[in-house]
Amino acid sequence: MPKIKTHRGAAKRFKQTAGGKWKGSHAFHSHILGKKTAKRKRNLRKVTVISMADARRLKRLLP
């Protein structure tokens, strides 16, 4: 039986917290930023907790 491979793209983007939740950065903060307000861009810099639906998917990508 071969080893299960880690999805390298997901491994670089998401980290698991000590409590078992997943954290990652917000989307929509790489380009086309001129029309977005300063408050919105400031909030997009923060780290976010991944939703439970996506966390189940991450569990499969990152064994």
From Swiss-Prot:
Residues 1-15 have a biased composition (Basic residues). Keywords: Ribonucleoprotein, Ribosomal protein. The lineage of its organism: Bacteria, Bacillati, Bacillota, Clostridia, Eubacteriales. It comes from Pelotomaculum thermopropionicum (strain DSM 13744 / JCM 10971 / SI). The keyword Transcription does not apply. The gene is rpmI. Residues 1-26 are annotated as: Disordered. This is Large ribosomal subunit protein bL35. InterPro entries: Ribosomal_bL35, Ribosomal_bL35-like, Ribosomal_bL35_CS, Ribosomal_bL35_sf. Belongs to the bacterial ribosomal protein bL35 family. It comes from the Bacteria. GO terms for biological process: translation. One of its GO terms (cellular component) is cytosolic large ribosomal subunit. GO terms for molecular function: structural constituent of ribosome.
